[in-house]
Amino acid sequence: AAACLEFDPQKANLAYAGADIYLMPSKSEPCGLSQIIAMRFGTVPVVNATGGLKDTVWPYDPSSEQGRGFTFQSYNADDFLAAIDRSLQLFYDEPEKWARLSEADMSIDSSWKLPAQEYMELYKKAIG
């Protein structure tokens, strides 16, 4: 057996695209891009609601179909497993909702266009 110790972006993209769920139980995460990349490929994230993960993965509510993934608040195995269980319940019991969540995640605009416009507006207000 051999180990591949160098990063291959094509293989990474295949892994993102081939997965249904992306697990990211980071204890802390200033920003994080991998959950955004996962969503772009339609892979639903399960994350600890901390730092940038909390800013980019809003908790999914099956009744309103709002949200971007599944989150947990306390950094422990039980809460992480509960979030995984919620995601699997939707995946197996309501596949049509799962498909809509995955498609909605793929449609997220994660470009710099909107943030750049917002910063420009702030700068314009600051200088009068």
Cite the ranges covered by each PLM segment.
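Nucleotide-activated donor-binding/catalytic signature segment of Leloir-type glycosyltransferases, i.e.
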Residues: 1-11
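C-terminal alpha-helical cap of glycosyltransferases
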Residues: 112-128
